Amino acid sequence: MDLSSLSPAKGSVKNKKRVGRGQGSGNGTTAGKGNKGQQSRSGYKRPVSEGGQMPLYRRLPKFGFTKPNRKSVIGVNLSQIAKWIEDGRVSSEVGVEDFKQLCNASKSDYFKVLGNGELGTAVKITAHFVSKSAEEKIKQAGGEVILAERTLLEAERVRDLSTDEALLKPKAKLRKFKKQSKSS
């Protein structure tokens, strides 16, 4: 047996269908496209034409909406944080900016630390949310948990404070003003 004598199993490889190469090929003239008209031409075809039938997009009602200020929460496990520390991507302090960069997230995302995995070293973690099991494991390892009050985007918009300080400062509660009735 030589390399030159090798061939694929019989019937496993099909010949390519060469369309539009004469009547004798069985795929000549219209090249498998049927008769004349828009469907036989190259380029654009109407994607949702249903003839005279009421189209699907008009048969179904409108529903739902996308909340413009929705919270997007990204979960990060302790095992991921431990791996980042081993790889030298983060030091003993892991902040919201580190999460944003390493999770490929946006500035408006919230981060939650989850308890899957173990931490071998003491780590200071700043995140928006922390699960109970994660908090216990971090404290057992000698670490510290700090809860951030704002997203990075919100913190950047605070003029008086640096981004790090603004992350930790609670948002001011809005005061509701009551309309005073006119006394006559």
UniProtKB/Swiss-Prot annotation:
Cite the GO molecular-function annotations of the record: rRNA binding; structural constituent of ribosome
Q: What function is annotated for this protein?
A: Binds to the 23S rRNA.
The record's annotation in PANTHER family points to: 50S RIBOSOMAL PROTEIN L15, LARGE RIBOSOMAL SUBUNIT PROTEIN UL15M
Q: Where is this region: Disordered?
A: 1-55
Q: Work out whether the entry's keyword set contains Ribonucleoprotein.
A: yes
Cellular component terms, GO, for this chain's entry? cytosolic large ribosomal subunit
What InterPro entries does the record tag this protein with? Ribosomal_uL15, Ribosomal_uL15/eL18, Ribosomal_uL15/eL18_sf, Ribosomal_uL15_bac-type, Ribosomal_uL15_CS
Q: Which NCBIfam families match?
A: rplO_bact
Name under which the protein is recorded: Large ribosomal subunit protein uL15
Q: Does Secreted count among this protein's keywords?
A: no
Q: Where is the composition biased (Gly residues)?
A: 21-35
Per the record, the GO terms for biological process are: translation
Keyword vocabulary terms for this entry: Ribonucleoprotein, Ribosomal protein, RNA-binding, rRNA-binding
A Pfam match = Ribosomal_L27A
Q: Which cysteines are joined by disulfide bonds?
A: none
Q: Which family does it belong to?
A: Belongs to the universal ribosomal protein uL15 family.
Gene that encodes it: rplO
Q: Which HAMAP family match?
A: Ribosomal_uL15
User: What does the subunit comment say?
Assistant: Part of the 50S ribosomal subunit.
